[in-house]
Curated annotation (Swiss-Prot):
Name under which the protein is recorded: Chromosome partition protein MukB
Statement: the UniProt record of this protein carries the keyword Cell cycle: yes
Segments of skewed composition (Basic and acidic residues): 1051-1065
Phylogenetic classification of the source organism: Bacteria, Pseudomonadati, Pseudomonadota, Gammaproteobacteria, Enterobacterales
GO cellular component, one term: nucleoid
Entry similarity comment: Belongs to the SMC family. MukB subfamily.
Amino acid sequence: MIERGKFRSLTLINWNGFFARTFDLDELVTTLSGGNGAGKSTTMAAFVTALIPDLTLLHFRNTTEAGATSGSRDKGLHGKLKAGVCYSMLDTINSRHQRVVVGVRLQQVAGRDRKVDIKPFAIQGLPMSVQPTQLVTETLNERQARVLSLAELKDKLDEMEGVQFKQFNSITDYHSLMFDLGIIARRLRSASDRSKFYRLIEASLYGGISSAITRSLRDYLLPENSGVRKAFQDMEAALRENRLTLEAIRVTQSDRDLFKHLISEATDYVAADYMRHANERRVHLDQALAFRRELYTSRKQLAAEQYKHVDMARELGEHNGAEGSLEADYQAASDHLNLVQTALRQQEKIERYEADLEELQIRFEEQNEVVAEAAEMQDENEARAEAAELEVDELKSQLADYQQALDVQQTRAIQYNQAISALARAKELCHLPDLTPESAAEWLDTFQAKEQEATEKLLSLEQKMSVAQTAHSQFEQAYQLVAAINGPLARSEAWDVARELLRDGVNQRHLAEQVQPLRMRLSELEQRLREQQEAERLLAEFCKRQGKNFDIDELEALHQELEARIASLSESVSSASEQRMALRQEQEQLQSRIQHLMQRAPVWLAAQNSLNQLSEQCGEEFTSSQEVTEYLQQLLEREREAIVERDEVGARKNAVDEEIERLSQPGGAEDQRLNALAERFGGVLLSEIYDDVSLEDAPYFSALYGPSRHAIVVPDLSQIAEQLEGLTDCPEDLYLIEGDPQSFDDSVFSVDELEKAVVVKIADRQWRYSRFPSLPIFGRAARENRIESLHAEREVLSERFATLSFDVQKTQRLHQAFSRFIGSHLSVAFEDDPEAEIRRLNGRRVELERALATHESDNQQQRLQFEQAKEGVSALNRLLPRLNLLADETLADRVDEIQERLDEAQEAARFVQQYGNQLAKLEPMVSVLQSDPEQFEQLKEDYAWSQQMQRDARQQAFALAEVVERRAHFSYSDSAEMLSGNSDLNEKLRQRLEQAEAERTRAREALRSHAAQLSQYSQVLASLKSSYDTKKELLNDLQRELQDIGVRADSGAEERARQRRDELHAQLSNNRSRRNQLEKALTFCEAEMENLTRKLRKLERDYHEMREQVVTAKAGWCAVMRMVKDNGVERRLHRRELAYLSADELRSMSDKALGALRLAVADNEHLRDVLRLSEDPKRPERKIQFFVAVYQHLRERIRQDIIRTDDPVEAIEQMEIELSRLTEELTSREQKLAISSRSVANIIRKTIQREQNRIRMLNQGLQSVSFGQVNSVRLNVNVRETHATLLDVLSEQQEQHQDLFNSNRLTFSEALAKLYQRLNPQIDMGQRTPQTIGEELLDYRNYLEMEVEVNRGSDGWLRAESGALSTGEAIGTGMSILVMVVQSWEDEARRLRGKDISPCRLLFLDEAARLDARSIATLFELCERLQMQLIIAAPENISPEKGTTYKLVRKVFQNTEHVHVVGLRGFAPQLPETLPGTQAEDTPSEAS
């Protein structure tokens, strides 16, 4: 016998009046007595709070504001607590003898809302010796203690070995533990269950008949037939699911092509774009690499062009500089030629003028001599004319004087005066102041002698003059020549200078004779020098082009080396073309081979995909076509074996289904006809009577009744005898047993129970031995157990059958796949991998391209070397003949030397040309320069002075002679003597005068003629002199101009200048031609550089754009790949055969698929939106999202309970395998699961009958309950009329309403609701749906009406209402009802809890003083009979002789309020003893 769990004690910590109080609870009744305010309600409130710690339910009305419903109001709990931590704990012992302490920690929350914080907890494994108060309090001293917090309590319990502490965050977990450990009678899963439990406790606490419970007695008393309801729901759900599955299959069958089309088009749409992006990414990578290679190549080309540009710019600069210098040189040469030509013309002029000057010089000299002679003759004529004139004048004067003396008497005076005048003139002329007429004669002789002397001297001087004049003219001429040649010099230096000039002239003539040879030599040397300079320039250019400096001695060896290199390079170039041709031919062959393989690769890939699918499906690896055909044979054999096994499993499954169907019949009837016969006979199946038999008793009763376990129990066998006549629709053996179905027992047999068997004595001579069946099916529990095992077996069989069917279908499809593979791909599937060959060939192609590039580079380099070698040889060919010139290091010095000698010779030639004539003239007369002939000028002056002296002497002599002649005049006083004495004189004077006049005339005529002639001669001389001077001046000017020109005007100068100019012109033309070539090349190079720069910028831009595109695409591609791998669709999207299609073909493929997809998803808003978003070409990941969305959509559309994969493609493939099988199976399953209205009515009726029987059993326990005038209490259960009509229609008239139950659009619940509305149109169903109403109609509790009736005095049975009963009667009646509810809960929960646990039973009763002693005794008896604990409260002791009584007295001590408690056990024969712990229990409270 399982002991019932009990509450041991209630502990209050820090409650109002109770600091640390533990109430030991009696096993039956615990009474709390005391006056008002003693703490009875507080104690019960603490118990209820620990039992149901739900603040939404707790409501202690006796201390709460009346009518208050607000959640913020005090529900009566806040005022019962004291400040700080409070506890309420229940100490229990369950049926397993486990001590469990459950309780709550309470604490007031500060604020005006007066709220309380509650934390439930549980303690397991606590030793019996530990009191609850010891756990939550800490003793400080003898009079003080402290309450521990929950955390401290946890820490304290953690230190205790074997003690478990649990704190709960939800009330559901708290109540679940209490239910599992047997503390409460019902599992409180929800707030509704807690509310029912609280209403039960509340009704018990406050007593009376609770309207909240009586109105809903069905919920409290009638257990929810969850099994039946769940069976109905499962069956209906299975049917609904079956129908939905069938409909889904039909829809899937109809949409299968659409799904295939959707998957195919979505795969084409996304895979084409996926592979296009993959191809484009590879192409972009290749393009980026190509761009980078081309970029590097262009950079190298640009660098080479820049170097070339720099070289050409430098060379152009050199040529520009050289052109400037050449232009200057050419201009200088042209100017020099012009100057030479000008100088030549000047020289011709000079020579012409020099010839003219020489001729003029000769003529001038000749004319000068003529003029000199004419001048001498003129002087002589002048002297002769003057002398004649003087003689005429003297004679005229003499004659005049004489005539005057003769004519006039005064002639003496005149003569005397004339004598005096003559004396005076003589004195004056002779400078003789002492001259007298007497001394005149003496002086006359003297002066005549002097005159004679002067005349002789004059004649001598005239002779010298004549001689000196000739010498002087020669000297002057020689001196003038010397001065003209040498320049101004002293006359004394003329001889020395003339000799030097003559010696120098000889040297200069010698040098001048060397001008032409020197000039020819210089021209030759200059030509060689120019050739040497040209050779040096060529050598410098050659070294510059070769990039190395070479010695002259190395050039011949280098020439031979270059010729050898040219020969080898020409051979290499000629062989390179053949090698290049071979490489290109191999490259073309590789390209054609690659094209062929690329055309074959998609076919091979399709074959490989098919082969891989076959390998995945069969799990085998195939390496040859023979293995494929062998495996196909194995597949056929496996298919035959699987079909055989499937049929066997199907047969066994059908048998199990039939057995399950048989065991699932209502009431346990294995034959449907038994139910009809039981209704016909008005009896009950024996199996239905024993439907509640436990699983342990099922074998016994099954063996007890044996074959009659399917008998029908009827009240009277005699009444059905007539009905047995003609009975055909029945089992072969029909057992009928007479008995009361309501009180049937097994006393009809005499039974002896053996070990696992019974012996039934049917009659004196007939016994039946029956062993306990190993699988009993008698009783609902046994049937359910068997059905459960059968269901498990059926599940295994169904799974096995499904697996085998699937395997068969799979094998058949695999066979078809193998057949298709053999027909389509077997010929190519096992060939070599074309992609590997393509990769190998591509590698070889890359090697060939690299080799071609290297070959082109080498060939280009060889060509460049060949050209360089040819240029080098050409340059050397020009250089080698000039090696002697290059080796001649003294050539420039010799040119300078010859140039200097030529300059000297030309200078000498110019000197000779200029002064040769003067030197030639000077040479014969150089001797005259040895001495200056007395200085001819001085001689001329002496001659003039002597001439003057002779003239003066003549005049003096004449004057003296006149004085002497007139000496008589001084003594004569008259002239008569003179006239007479000189008459002859007059005549002589006249003759002489005539002669003198004639001489004078002749002299004058000669003088005039000579003067004219002299004038003419002088004019000719002057003109000659003027012409000479002019030409001399012009000559000097020309010579100065020639000197200013500064060139040598020789005969070869013009030719050399012209040759030099022509050479410079040729060099300038060549330089300009080269410069133009360089400019063109430079322009072309600059254009090439600009093109390369633009190309480089474009390449850099394209490369950066491509690289950025690659990087961006890589990020997007990584996101796409991540999305693809995360969603596992890479295998679907990475279709290698698409890699061989072009981007346009893939784009066309994707566009075609897009058009098809738009039509396919036109009715699906989500897929349509995702497809529209996926059309963005910049967001390829959205296409993956669309593909995933399509797959997700297909996963949602395809039943996952039918298909064993998440891959829609595989699901469709599997579904094609399963469709026909599932359709047939689900159709048969629907037929099996179909619910008949009659069976539903029977199930509901049987359930109602069973519950009615259970209520009758409960009523038997209440028959002896009496309170006051109430003699008995019972529950009356009736079926509602509307629902009874519904059951009748379901049983008898279901054919009239088959339109509802045969409709595929309505579930059975909905059809049941429609039928109920059709039968009861007057009832308003409100807003409830037919499904909800139908589910309510499937719950048998809604068919019943329950009410409590009491048998009160003379009134008999009447409905229990508070108004018709006294307070005590109502309390007793209500307590009886609550006991029934608790017992009902235990029966209902027995299947949910362990079989070894009997839960605690405890109720409350406050204000129990309203019951009389008889009613109290009845309560005590009821508690004893039902093993129930009861806590009652009353102002006074109502029954101290039974149970445990606590006397509570509230006291105030030193301003501290506490409750004094005294506990007494019930009276017994021995003296009553005080309960342990009650003497000192107030100490903590008082201490507080």
